């Protein structure tokens, strides 16, 4: 009969092995679930920001909304257009533009073919780009108008939020919609190019066109270039009805929820097999000792 201490050591080793297996499975599950769950959480926050903005604007007096839009048009007319460069002395004025709700949200952008509906914020600070789409200072405010070009940028490839991850899937002819104040502006994709970060020539104004350019990093995960997707203003009536709150189910999120029970079942199976390895051997030893007695 083995000493009692030896038996306790073996049991302790088995317990440690079980705990290690459980910890390993839980860690793997958390690593697997983090991207889709974080993306789902951020999507809900972005959706809430869009809904909150639209509700707040709808409650404003029409005269107040028109006044803010008139101020934005005057700002665009006087703007020395230079993407990414705005004198510090002009920053306060810029931040006051399109401030309908007392927040930094100046509007929303919807890309129906990608299931994207995001708030647009002033500046391209990192905190902004983690939360939604940023407007590049020094470019036209996104209110439309011939001879203007608003440049909007978003992150691509964040594990916690999709944002502009699928921007490369847009094709010429696709539509995106900008909502700011009581204006709803549709743009049809006309140009898609890749440039170096320093090549800002592709972002210049065109006197007879009303343009919005969407910018993100490319190639995916390498980010040495910039993908520029430019849309030209089109009649909203030609686009048809677009629901602002259209629902799309992320297949990655579905896969994550399907994976949870699979992980749990796998954990149970492994633990049972681990215990079954020990059980027959110890039972055999116990019976042989009993026979000797």
Predicted regions and their residues:
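Solvent-exposed, non-transmembrane regions of membrane-associated and secreted proteins
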Residues: 11-254, 279-289
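Cationic-aromatic interfacial patches
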Residues: 2-12
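A general, composition-driven signal for non-globular sequence regions
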Residues: 7, 39, 266-267
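Single-pass type I membrane protein transmembrane segment
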Residues: 256-260
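Alpha-helical transmembrane segments
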Residues: 261-276
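Solvent-exposed, low-complexity, intrinsically disordered
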Residues: 1-4, 284-293
């Amino acid at each position: 009969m083995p000493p009692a201490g030896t038996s306790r050591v073996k049991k302790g080793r088995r317990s440690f092995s079980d705990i290690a297996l459980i910890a390993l499975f839980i860690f793997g599950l958390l690593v697997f679930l983090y991207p889709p769950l974080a993306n789902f959480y951020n999507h809900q926050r972005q959706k809430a920001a869009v809904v909150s903005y639209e509700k707040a604007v709808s409650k404003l007096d029409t005269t107040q909304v028109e006044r803010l839009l008139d101020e934005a048009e005057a700002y665009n007319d006087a703007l020395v257009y230079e993407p990414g460069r705005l004198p510090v002395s002009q920053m306060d004025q810029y931040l006051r533009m399109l401030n309908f709700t007392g927040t930094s949200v100046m509007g929303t952008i919807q890309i129906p073919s990608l299931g994207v509906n995001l708030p647009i914020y002033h500046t391209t600070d990192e905190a902004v780009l983690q939360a939604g789409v940023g407007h590049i200072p020094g470019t036209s405010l996104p209110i439309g108008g011939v001879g203007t070009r608003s440049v909007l940028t978003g992150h691509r490839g964040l594990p916690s939020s999709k944002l502009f991850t699928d921007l490369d899937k847009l094709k010429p002819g696709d539509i995106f919609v900008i909502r700011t104040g009581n204006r709803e502006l549709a743009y049809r994709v006309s140009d898609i190019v890749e440039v170096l970060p320093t090549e800002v020539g592709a972002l210049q104004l065109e006197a007879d066109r009303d343009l919005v350019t969407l910018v993100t990093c490319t190639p995916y995960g390498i980010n040495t270039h910039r993908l520029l997707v430019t849309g030209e203003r089109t009649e909203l009536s030609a686009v048809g009805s677009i629901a602002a709150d259209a629902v799309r189910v992320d297949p990655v999120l579905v896969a994550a929820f399907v994976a949870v029970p699979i992980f749990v079942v796998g954990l149970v199976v492994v633990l049972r097999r681990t215990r079954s390895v020990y059980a027959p051997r110890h039972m055999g030893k116990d019976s042989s000792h009993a026979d000797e007695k």
